[in-house]
Amino acid sequence: RNGDEPMMRVLAAAGADATKSNRFGVTPLMAAACLDYYEGETAGPFSGVPEPQRLEAVKLALALGNQINARTTFGDYKMIGTPETTLLRYPDNFQDLVDLGTGDPRFAEMTALHGAVICNQPSIVKYLIEQGAEVNARNRLGWTPLMISGGLYIANAHKTSPGSAQILREALAAQGLNRR
């Protein structure tokens, strides 16, 4: 199960490297915040945990030394399309990228905050911002967490995060940043 805080504690107690990322740069914090798996992505049963438990996993990952603004590393592949259009469909040159074995290349340079927004988890969005997450972080395609909150086509569905959008707008305004 993703975001499983009790299992994370067991693994850390057994000596697992609590900051080790996978080959795409996804850290335990990112996975806990939901930048790993999206309900509806596969036909199987719900495999995550409720948002309050996932929030505890996020807190634990930070306490264990994960960097709050770490970025994914899906590769440095040219992707064609605007930030706005690639939120709703794959890059125009997706056929050139599909066999590279990188997963969804649109997720290059994402942060834990991006993941929390994708999964519509406002409590985690708020907590990450309070802990210093870069509110206006842009991925390789230029997506910000606020842009994602307005809608992202992923796992054969259009996902929005209206609760996160309000938190992000308030944080951006408090920091005097662009509200995009």
Predicted regions and their residues:
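Ankyrin repeat A-helix N-terminal signature
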Residues: 1-4, 31-54, 80-108, 115-121, ...
